[in-house]
Amino acid sequence: MKLVIAEKPSVAMSLAAVLGATERKDGYLEGSGYLVSWCVGHLLELAQPEAYKEQYAKWRYEDLPILPENWKYEVPKDKKTQLALLCRLMKDKRVDSVVCATDAGREGELIFRLVYEYAGCKKPMERLWISSMEDAAIREGFDHLHPGSDYDKLYDAAVCRAGADWLIGINATRLFSVLYGVTLNVGRVMSPTLALLVQRESDIESFISKPFYVPEITCGGFTASGEKMTERSEAEKIRMDCDHNSAFVRSVEKQVKTIQPPRLYDLTTLQRECNRIYGYTAQQTLDYVQSLYEKKLATYPRTDSQYLTKDMQATAASLILWLRDNMPFGKGYAGEPDIDRVTDDSKVTDHHAIIPTVEIARTDLSELPSGERDVLTLLAVRLLCATTQVHRFEAVTAILDCQGYTFTAKGKTILQSGWKEVERIHRMSIRQSETEHKENEAVALPVLQEGQTFEAVSASLREGKISPPKHYTEDTLLSAMETAGAEDMPEDAERKGLGTPATRAATLEKLVSAGFVQRKKKQLIPTEKGKNLIAVLPDNIKSPILTAEWESMLKQVEHGELSATSFMDQIADMSRTLVKEHTTPEERFADLFPSSRGTAHEAVGVCPRCGAPVYEGKKGFFCDNRECSFALWKDNRFFSSKKKSITKSVAAALLKEGRISMSGLYSEKTGKTYDAEVILDDTGGKYVNFKLEFPVKKGRRK
């Protein structure tokens, strides 16, 4: 009997249905020689520093860098039951082999392997590697299972990725948080991405907008423009010289140009397009296309390829013909499908481009949630665009002379709409399409000939301002992340850029949730906290070049070209250097980090739970670590019952000594006052507890 382990319940249900495992059990399905169960995402996570040494529970410079020799893992409380079940199933005597059916990628491999190793399982392991959840694809995958050992290097790369994120995240976060007295979350991919946003914001803020002036002449139903100028008087002189005078055509140049169809979508280009057209965040798009994949309507989403493989050509051709004949935008499709244009086995590694599956023909799209419907429609539109005719037009450039000044008029005439007709029909059906269409609309010039003369032209002055750089949107930031550091890497480097298609969306969400970035409509704007963090970080942490190199090295680990040990040694060395080179806060950054919760710059004390600074707020004293719940409330029930409150001096004493001597404590029972030591008795729960300790009374002399 085979035990099949999927990444999530919905996928397990689909696999079980195809395999005939229809008998429901508690946490798994059984039947036809299979047990089918699931993980719920990561069942095991890298343990926090205090799991290695108790002293690491507090954030202290002298403990850095923290470099575990062997990784420890912990189980989230809400996942212990499922992990225990999988361990039991792996040890079941009926099970003679285990099939890894988690997502076919680096993270999916890590999710399964950690469970397999945690259970101490030694049974043969096989790998299901598919790019579609269609029944036929599942059957094909189970008919051709791969030896699990084929993916050992993929697992090594996954462990390295997680380990590198832990080492940089833990050490850099603690280092700069301790130095500057406020929690500063640093991440291997997150920080360079934030740096891109901060640099763009700096470029915008420092930009000095200057006006420009363009003299123009209108004649024969078209407008020709002169040279852009910065001096109004100069441009105005040209306008006055030309107005109501004659102009003649000095030259006419015609050139037939071709725009090739776009490539198919990989995850990043799909996320960019969805943000630009619909305003969806990268995470929303990933969620929608993941759901479509699980519903068997789209192929595997976490891909960086924009091509198909040769064995898909027949299926793709029949799908294209169905889309052409049944979808509204199919009316714009011309000619026979050119599948060869989107086929290249050498450019497909783990997974091919994202396309719809044939299940779309059996699905009522109106019943899908709007986000999923939008994404699936885009996938269908792109498949048609990528395989139909090229877009061809004639570009015309006319040079006119008026009073010795040169003016240029440009226009174009569509010769073959090609793929742009499919796109045009689709865009006309969605919101904000009219404006976009008009902006891209071709403007044809009248027939012009050299020497042609126009009498009494109308001259005018067009004014404008040089625009500053635009704020990043998720569309443009994803593009920047994809190419970051590419110019500093060799041409043959397999992976360039920040993060992977599968992780970029999560990186953006972390930046927002950590308070480093805020969304304003489609724009991503760094906050003051984000700007200040980038100000104090060293160049190698915030530079995309080093992180892009690491991504390329992880690919080398995956292919067996670099050992996991070599990779991790480099990360550890960087962690050591980081701590060694930053021993004290820089004076120029001293005032950048007032408490996000408090009113004073100075910390009241140190959190007894995590070692982060504690600041005074309006209603209490709070740990600055967002993940820590420690708080001393000013209007505390324990103190208020004794007609006292936690003042700043009381809080400081409790945090420093763990106790404070207080006089005049009120007794609700006797109505009298007394003196006692108040002791901070924190057990790590939601609320902080206190207890009293009374001074020992001296005995009477006999």
Regions found by a protein language model. Give the residues of each.
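Intrinsically disordered, low-complexity regulatory segments
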Residues: M1-A162, W166, I430, V457, ...
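Basic, low-complexity terminal or inter-domain segments flanking catalytic cores
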Residues: K2-L3, M90, T173, A282-Q283, ...
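Short, polar/flexible loop-turn hinges at active-site or ligand-entry regions and domain interfaces
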Residues: W71-E74, T102, K122-E126, P147-L154, ...
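Metal- or metallocofactor-binding catalytic centers and their adjacent structured scaffolds
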Residues: R232-Y265, Q271
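C-terminal or mid-to-C-terminal helical accessory/interaction module adjacent to the motor/catalytic core
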Residues: K93, D135-C219, K254-T258
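Helical mechanochemical/support elements of P-loop NTPase systems and associated helical scaffolds
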Residues: E7, V11, D78-L86, A104-V115, ...
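Conserved short loop/turn motifs at secondary-structure junctions
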Residues: M1-L3, A101-A104, G181-T183, K254-R263, ...
